[in-house]
Amino acid sequence: DFPKLEILFNTNEDHRKIALAIQQMWQTTLGIEVELVNQDWKVYLNREMIGDFQVSRAGWIGDYEDPNTFLDTLRPNRGNNKTGWENKKYDDLLELANSTNDTEKRYNLLMQAERILIDEMPIVPLYTYVRSYQLSEDVKGYFPNYLDHHHPKYIYLERD
């Protein structure tokens, strides 16, 4: 029998729905008993920081458009690596990737690092945020981005 698992999540209705869905799927499909542990933000962050969890619902939105924005979060001593996971080869590949000016070589090194991450699975990506946009063709200078930040300085109307 698989031992009972706890899923830690912070107080937020969307996070609660995700935790409930995981609980239901794991119990129904895998027969794993899952206890949901809801904590306010400060307690949740503290428990994550000290590693006081079995499974934790966390999130990350890439703050720049590059694979490194996600890969770098799982290096040791990074503020977002709450997993305790470390892999020297992974770290070495990221160091090499970030020290080369050869784009093809860099992406190959990042791909090798990502393969290690996929093989060892210290995290389980569940979903990505999506947004729907409807813009007039007259709107110029507006480009979708991960953080959904749009400086009005660069957005303007241009009528044909």
Predicted regions and their residues:
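Extracytoplasmic/secreted proteins, especially bacterial periplasmic and envelope-associated proteins
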Residues: D14-M25, V43, D66-T69, K89-L96, ...
